[in-house]
């Protein structure tokens, strides 16, 4: 097992070499270096983007039908896998219940300027990127240890609003 005493004062070279080849990566800082999709934690960003651009208000209600059919791959709300939908839901309730369907529709509205234009990935993504940047999610945290750069999604706004698509962040970047 890992013993930091063997690395204090003088370094046991053989031990250090074994740590570097250990498949469990005991020297790898997962909190700052491993990037992953943020998932539902990103829904706060999507809420801010939707509210500030006016595609939703605090009282806007969206009917969760389980399967989102406005785009071709028809993503599903997680609740449907448990035999129900969230029904008519507003942004506060959608955050509380982590309703994917609601945020799919926010992404769609961002990509269509609230249904006034045809669907355009670039339009939706640029708005998501703008608000993620305003919230500091386009930069590292500044802690004084090695940290991977964050990646804001650059495709699929409907999926990006639930923290999927190609969003990628280190845990520390989401925790600030």
What do these predicted regions represent?
Residues 1-40, 45-176:
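Beta-lactam-recognizing serine transpeptidase/beta-lactamase-like catalytic domain environment
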């Amino acid at each position: 097992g890992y013993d930091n005493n063997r690395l204090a004062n003088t370094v046991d070279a053989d031990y250090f070499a074994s740590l570097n080849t250990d498949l469990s990566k005991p020297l790898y800082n997962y909190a700052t270096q491993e990037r992953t999709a943020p998932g539902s934690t990103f829904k706060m960003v999507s809420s801010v983007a939707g509210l500030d651009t006016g595609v939703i208000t605090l009282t806007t209600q969206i009917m969760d039908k389980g399967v989102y059919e406005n785009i071709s791959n028809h993503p599903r709300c997680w609740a449907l896998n448990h035999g129900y939908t969230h029904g008519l839901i507003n942004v506060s309730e959608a955050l509380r219940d982590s309703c994917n369907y609601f945020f799919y529709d926010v992404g769609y509205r961002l990509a269509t300027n609230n249904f006034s234009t045809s669907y355009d990935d670039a339009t939706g993504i640029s708005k998501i990127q703008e608000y993620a940047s305003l919230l500091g999610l386009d930069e590292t945290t500044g802690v004084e240890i090695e940290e991977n750069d964050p990646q804001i999604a650059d495709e699929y706004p409907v999926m990006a609003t639930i923290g999927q698509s190609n969003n990628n962040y280190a845990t520390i970047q989401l925790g600030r």
